[in-house]
């Protein structure tokens, strides 16, 4: 069997015995096969130069380029911090973003309380004080008397006026509660409203016909009570409704006497501005001005005493 060398197979050249060339087909004799292979290699080289990277490398470069473009776009979209206006814009954007992320909790409305059992008097009075409207409504719907009271003759209306529970006051008045009902100290609803300081309740009572001149057992008017408790808006409304500025209580004190004694500066200014008399004397023969001087003298005496004691202490310390 004839053995061919690789060189003879590729080049088509004969070996020394002149036998190899006879094996090759006629078309590939005289080096034509070598020329064909060389031409094919040259074509492969051109393709390699035109496409120097593989397909995987092309995809990797494409992804990198896309990421770079996205990053550049994001940077361009960002606000440049060049002045205070830019800073303000950034802050507002941050706030909006935070607001969008914050979920608003859904607040469920409490289910209306349904009272099926009968309501007794103590529970009814307590409900008026604690603003439990369903309990009050149940008591009234059972045709009970709205003017029932405790041992001090204080009604549900008195209690609701003190605490400023407007809805309960309205419900009681619709049921026929007496506005002028007096407790053990002869205070009416208007006294209790002035003591509690709720202007809306006070306005409702006056609109429903409550007597602005009503006096309690100490002969105090609603204006006296509002001044003593420091409820400025209530006092101002009572004055606007023509309450008596110079009404005297059992001690002969006017609202101005009370304001001076309690050192309520805003009340003093309010009463004087609307024309309160500075020269009215109480049962002790003192005018509001006398009380001011008495207060000033008393304060001066206290400071003089403190200064004298301080002086004596310092002299003792020197010996």
From Swiss-Prot:
A molecular function GO annotation: R-SMAD binding
GO cellular component labels: cytoplasm; cytosol; fibrillar center; I band; nucleoplasm; nucleus; transcription regulator complex
Subcellular compartments: Nucleus
Major subcellular site: nucleus
SMART domains found in the cross-reference section: ANK
Inducing factors: By TNF, IL1A/interleukin-1 alpha and parthenolide.
SUPFAM superfamilies attached to this UniProt entry: Ankyrin repeat
ANK repeats: 152-181, 185-214, 218-247, 251-280, 284-315
Alphabetical GO biological process terms: cardiac muscle tissue morphogenesis; cellular response to hypoxia; cellular response to interleukin-1; cellular response to lipopolysaccharide; cellular response to mechanical stimulus; cellular response to transforming growth factor beta stimulus; cellular response to tumor necrosis factor; cellular response to xenobiotic stimulus
Keywords: ANK repeat, Coiled coil, Nucleus, Repeat
Complexes and interactors: Interacts with YBX1. Interacts with TTN/titin.
PANTHER family cross-referenced by the UniProt entry: ANKYRIN REPEAT DOMAIN-CONTAINING PROTEIN 1, ANKYRIN REPEAT, PH AND SEC7 DOMAIN CONTAINING PROTEIN SECG-RELATED
The protein, known as: Ankyrin repeat domain-containing protein 1
């Amino acid at each position: 069997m004839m053995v061919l060398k690789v060189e003879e197979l590729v080049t088509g050249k004969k070996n020394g015995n002149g036998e190899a060339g006879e094996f090759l087909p006629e078309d590939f004799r005289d080096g034509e096969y070598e020329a064909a292979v060389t031409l094919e290699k040259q074509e492969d080289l051109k393709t390699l130069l035109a496409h120097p990277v593989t397909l995987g490398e092309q995809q990797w470069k494409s992804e990198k380029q896309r990421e770079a473009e996205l990053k550049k776009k994001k940077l361009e979209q960002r606000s440049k911090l060049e002045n205070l206006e830019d800073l303000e814009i950034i802050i507002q954007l941050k706030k909006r973003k935070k607001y969008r992320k914050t979920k608003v909790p859904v607040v469920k409305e409490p289910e209306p309380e349904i009272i099926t059992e009968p309501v007794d008097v103590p529970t009814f009075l307590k409900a008026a004080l604690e603003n439990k409207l369903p309990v009050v409504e149940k008591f009234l719907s059972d045709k009970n008397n709205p003017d029932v009271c405790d041992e001090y003759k204080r009604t549900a209306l008195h209690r609701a006026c003190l605490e400023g529970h407007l809805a309960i006051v309205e419900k009681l008045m619709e049921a026929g509660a007496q506005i002028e009902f007096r407790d053990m100290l002869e205070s009416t609803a208007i006294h209790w409203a002035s003591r509690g300081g709720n202007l809306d309740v006070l306005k409702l009572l006056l609109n429903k016909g409550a007597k602005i001149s009503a006096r309690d057992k100490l002969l105090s008017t609603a204006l006296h009570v509002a001044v003593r408790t420091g409820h400025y808006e209530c006092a101002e409304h009572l004055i606007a409704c023509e309450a008596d500025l110079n009404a005297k209580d059992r001690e002969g004190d006017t609202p101005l006497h009370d304001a001076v004694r309690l050192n309520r500066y805003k009340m003093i200014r309010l009463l004087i501005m609307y024309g309160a008399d500075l020269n009215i004397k109480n049962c002790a023969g003192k005018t509001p001005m006398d009380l001011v001087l008495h207060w000033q003298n008393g304060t001066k005496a206290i400071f003089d005493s403190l200064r004298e004691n301080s002086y004596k202490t310092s002299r003792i310390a020197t010996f």
